[in-house]
Amino acid sequence: MFDLDAYLARIGICDRPGLASVHRAHVISIPFENLDPRRGIPVSLELADLERKLVYQRRGGYCFEQNLLLKAALEALGHDVELLLARVRLGRPPDSPRPRTHLVLRVRADGAVWHADVGFGRGTLLEPIPFGPGGPHEQSGWRFRVVEDGPELVLQTAQNGEWIELYGFVPEPVPFIDVETSNWFTCTHPRSPFVTGLIVSAVRGDATRVSLSDWEGLALSEDNPAGGTVTPVQPAEVGRLIATRFGLEGFNG
């Protein structure tokens, strides 16, 4: 059985909160990271394993882990949650689509339907947004919108005066077995960026995003809606940065 009290303590909440409060607290409290796939360790999506890793061991995880943990919490709070699989569009030309390897949630709460996602790393939503086309939605200075592109709904974010595509998805729920298959590909395929690269991200209380990644050269980035900085990092610094900037001890990247 899911330990809701332990989860709420992990994200710093002591009462029975609403959807937006849970979502924002989760994003701020639990880092995004791929340290297990990076080290050749497959990712388990069993709820007990998610609780052990993200709640009790105070680790982070990537989209499947993050959003399945959020799903369990929201269901324990009485909300209806459906699973959706998305194709990441960020950094990808339109004629070269990626597989559906990103998990998104559709949540029914407070008499409305919401698009929830705590698992997109440095570009993730801070709070749920109304499900379907619409926006812009401003969240602590970050701006998001959803547009239609054929059968897909596409989440975009504003950067430097332009709308950047993050991911697209067909708004049809999928069974858990599809999520397991997508997760297995993501954490074990030799060409998966989560196997070959490093990404650790966190959102601060002031909505600043901090990321350590080697996807485009090993660097530490700090971003806020007004701009950001990128600082090159030496490999010998990785373990210290993972511990001091993201609260994850005992890892060397």
Each model region followed by its residue ranges:
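Mixed-charge, low-complexity segments
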Residues: M1-G60, E65, E75-P99, F120-G253
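Active-site beta-strand-loop-beta-strand hairpin of nuclease catalytic cores
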Residues: D110-W114
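Beta-strand scaffold of nucleotide-dependent catalytic cores
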Residues: A116-V118
